[in-house]
Structure formats: C-alpha cells, structure tokens
C-alpha cells in the first residue's frame, strides 16, 4: 500500500517494523525470492529453477524480486 516499504502483518519479522510498515535500519528487504536475512541476494543466485532448456531465473542483486526468464515446472 502507499507509503509502506514492507508488509507489517507480523511483529516477528526481523526486517520490517510492524508499527510503521517501514524496513528496519540496515534492512534492504523484508521478503521475496531474492531476499535473505533482510538483504538482497547476490547477483546470479538462482531464485527459480526453469523447466526444460530455459535458463534458471537469477537474482539481480538490486531487488528482492526474482525476474522471470523462461518456463517453469
């Protein structure tokens, strides 16, 4: 929603302040296939395995999202 940096549903989330819906100090992300321990995963980390001859999807190192490259099983 507007003004939110993260989903503030769970007070146990170490990356997101449940009271403000903002990332905690030092956190880059709170969830996503390319988010691990509140940090963006390294560029090239496989975040989704492809099906067949397509390439696996990999993290960009700049976002918690996993960009789609091909077909999946």
From Swiss-Prot:
Any one Gene Ontology MF annotation carried by this entry is: toxin activity
- Which InterPro entries has this protein been placed in? Disintegrin_CS, Disintegrin_dom, Disintegrin_dom_sf
Instruction: List each copy of the Disintegrin domain by range.
Output: 1-73
Which family does the similarity line name?
Belongs to the venom metalloproteinase (M12B) family. P-II subfamily. P-IIa sub-subfamily.
Q: How does this protein assemble?
A: Monomer.
The record describes the protein's role as: Inhibitor of ligand binding to the integrins alpha-IIb/beta-3 (ITGA2B/ITGB3). Competition with fibrinogen for the RGD recognition sites on the alpha-IIb/beta-3 integrin results in the inhibition of platelet aggregation induced by ADP, thrombin, platelet-activating factor and collagen.
Q: Does the keyword Lyase apply?
A: no
Recorded protein name is Disintegrin barbourin
Question: What Pfam family is a match, any one?
Answer: Disintegrin
Motif Cell attachment site: where in chain: 51-53
- In which domain of life is the source organism classified? Eukaryota
The family database entries (SUPFAM superfamilies) matched by this protein are listed as: Blood coagulation inhibitor (disintegrin) (SSF57552)
């Amino acid at each position: 929603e507007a003004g939110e940096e993260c989903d503030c549903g769970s007070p146990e989330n170490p990356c997101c302040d449940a009271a403000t819906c903002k990332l905690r100090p030092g956190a880059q992300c709170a969830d996503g296939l390319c988010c691990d321990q509140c940090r963006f995963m390294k560029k090239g980390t496989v975040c989704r395995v492809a099906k067949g001859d397509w390439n696996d999807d990999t993290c960009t190192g700049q976002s918690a999202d996993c960009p789609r490259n091909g077909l999946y099983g």
